[in-house]
């Protein structure tokens, strides 16, 4: 698995502020991933090893971090903040997606706050997709609905 943020610094911050607390508060994950304090634990700021896999975290500003490792599951966060060209090797989204090409059943998840319409990477990717939406049942009547921000409380 690979998770990509706009910069390596953001990847480190998200690892410390989101991923580590998630592991520490989840008994199932805590059982799978050795504490960072353990010698040779496989648990570093930018990599979390577990039986059967590894979560590698990197920044979209690092061509080195976006190459050489095949990944079946790819999470791209805040893609509108990605550089248009990474070290002369191309755009970060394409470089990251190239890591998944060897897997027939790959999963790629792009997330971002859209920026300028017409220039937004997440808007472009959504327009190029099949534009599926996730529907959830209403807790009152069970009607399946697409969640919108204005519906959240």
Segments (PLM) and residue ranges:
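Phosphate/NTP-binding elements of NTP-utilizing enzymes
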Residues: 1-153
């Amino acid at each position: 698995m690979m998770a990509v943020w706009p910069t390596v610094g953001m990847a480190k911050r998200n690892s410390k502020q989101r991923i580590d607390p998630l592991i520490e508060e989840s008994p199932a994950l805590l059982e799978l991933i050795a504490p960072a304090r353990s010698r040779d634990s496989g648990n570093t700021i930018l990599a979390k090893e577990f039986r059967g896999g590894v979560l590698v975290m990197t920044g979209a500003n690092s061509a080195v971090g976006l190459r050489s490792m095949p990944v079946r599951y790819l999470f791209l966060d805040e893609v509108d903040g990605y550089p248009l060209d990474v070290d002369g090797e191309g755009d970060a989204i394409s470089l990251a997606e190239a890591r998944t090409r060897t897997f027939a059943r790959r999963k790629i998840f792009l997330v971002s706050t859209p920026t300028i319409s017409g220039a937004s990477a997440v808007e472009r990717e959504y327009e190029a997709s099949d534009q599926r939406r996730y529907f959830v049942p209403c807790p009152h009547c069970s009607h399946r609905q697409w969640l919108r921000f204005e519906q959240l409380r």
